[in-house]
A protein has these predicted regions:
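Hydrophobic, glycine/alanine-rich multi-pass transmembrane helices and their short helix-loop junctions
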Residues: 51-54, 146-196
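Short helix-capping/hinge motifs at transmembrane helix termini and TM-loop junctions
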Residues: 55-59, 86-88, 161-166, 200
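Hydrophobic transmembrane alpha-helices and their membrane-interface caps
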Residues: 62-115, 121, 165, 179, ...
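Helix-loop junctions and hydrophobic alpha-helical segments within the transmembrane domains
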Residues: 124-145
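Interfacial helix-loop-helix hairpins and adjacent transmembrane helices
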Residues: 186, 194-209
Length: 209
């Protein structure tokens, strides 16, 4: 804290100390931080659910939104895991990284859902649902990968620069974000769409006699 820093300055006046960052951690701040974090994330997820459910009501609506939220929860767990494994403090960078990944991942999901909706009108009666979804993913794969690779390269450069110049605050934001970006591509193609297909297929299956 500031009192401890002042004491060090007085005891060693000949040394040029630089105070880069000050963090206060106590039970009250921890509770307030977690509460605000949970409120922000829940609000973001609810808004995303409503948006996806309304925009893609022709292909499942609420179920499409629910499967997208499951994929987003996966991405948030990945980001949280990176913070825990690297022992990065859960501060403002944590929430910023989570909210950034939410926006990035849902963008990929919306692109593929939009392609599924379009292909449903074109090939809905000519292809099975798994084939239609597979076609939609293949059509969106190139764009998603190019966007992700470009973003990951930029983040990797930021990570290297932050290590060289010892910019801890930037490093603790960029590294979890890098892993979250990769997770977002995976969850969109392998979790959200597959859960949606499973739901639609199970719903369309005849009830056992």
């Amino acid at each position: 804290n500031s009192a401890a820093a002042s004491d060090v300055y007085k005891r060693q006046p000949d040394n040029a100390f630089v105070q880069n960052e000050v963090s206060n951690v106590d039970a009250t701040i921890g509770k307030e931080f977690m509460l605000k974090s949970i409120v922000a994330l829940v609000a973001a997820c609810v808004l995303i659910l409503l948006y996806v459910a309304y925009r893609f009501r022709r292909i499942g609506g609420l179920k499409a939104g629910s499967t997208a939220i499951v994929a987003l929860l996966h991405d948030m767990l990945v980001v949280f895991g990176v913070f825990v494994i690297l022992r990065i403090p859960l501060n403002g960078n944590f929430i910023a990284a989570l909210l950034t990944i939410l926006g990035y991942s849902i963008n990929d999901t919306v692109v593929i859902y939009d392609r599924i909706r379009e292909n449903t009108g074109l090939y809905g009666k000519k292809m099975s649902l798994p084939e239609l979804v597979n076609l939609s993913i293949n059509q969106s794969f190139g764009r998603s990968m190019m966007t992700s690779i470009t973003t990951c390269i930029a983040l990797a450069i930021v990570c290297v620069v932050s290590i060289i110049f010892k910019l801890d605050s930037i490093f603790t934001f960029a590294v979890p974000l890098l892993f979250g970006m990769v997770s977002g591509v995976y969850s969109t193609m392998c979790i959200a769409t597959q859960l949606w297909v499973s739901y639609k297929t199970r719903k369309a299956a005849p009830a056992p006699k």
